[in-house]
């Protein structure tokens, strides 16, 4: 650069012009999440706004999940076999929200079926409007084990985050 400057400063009064190659401005590409691989034996694709967090040793993964009214907590745990019955698990979650237990028939009426990378799975919303607390829970059979994904937030947060929650659950696959 200095050499160019010195050569351009001659004694004559001629105007010199130089041409420099244009560099391309970086293109802002949309952020695409790639599947996260880890030592758990499972991979997933999480929404860009979710923040990995520390959880208990029982959790395969933990995320802070922002929504307009605050921050939700998402956990992924793995249990052998079925991890207990659907009725036992859902009623445990209901008790955590100070709600009465339900029969398996009542629970199954509220469950929604989905298909994802691990196959068929179920999601249930458990909401206690009086406490302003809610869970969105998925039960995903995975061979000889079951994954449980639970999002804890307020009822408004559950409704806001539900689409991302379903996408996350559907993205879960077994890593090889």
Residue ranges and their predicted role:
Residues 4-72, 79-118, 127-132, 140-145, ...:
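N-terminal targeting sequences that direct proteins away from the cytosol to non-cytosolic compartments
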Residues 124:
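Hydrophobic residues at beta-strand termini and immediately following loops
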């Amino acid at each position: 650069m200095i050499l160019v400057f010195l050569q351009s400063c001659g004694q004559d009064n001629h105007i010199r012009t130089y041409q420099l190659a244009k560099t391309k401005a970086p293109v802002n590409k949309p952020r695409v999440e790639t599947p996260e691989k880890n030592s758990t034996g499972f991979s997933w694709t999480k929404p860009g706004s979710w923040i990995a967090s520390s959880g208990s040793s029982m959790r395969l993964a933990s995320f802070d999940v922002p929504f307009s009214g605050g921050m939700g907590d998402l956990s992924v745990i793995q249990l052998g076999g079925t991890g207990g019955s659907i009725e036992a698990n859902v009623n445990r979650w209901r008790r955590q929200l100070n709600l009465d237990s339900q029969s398996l028939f009542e629970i199954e009426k509220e469950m929604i079926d989905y298909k994802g990378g691990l196959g068929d799975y179920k999601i249930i919303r458990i909401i206690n409007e009086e406490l302003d607390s809610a869970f969105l829970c998925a039960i995903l059979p995975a061979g000889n084990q079951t994954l449980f994904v639970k999002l804890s937030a307020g009822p408004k947060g559950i409704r806001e985050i539900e689409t991302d929650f379903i996408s996350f659950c559907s993205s879960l696959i077994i890593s090889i």
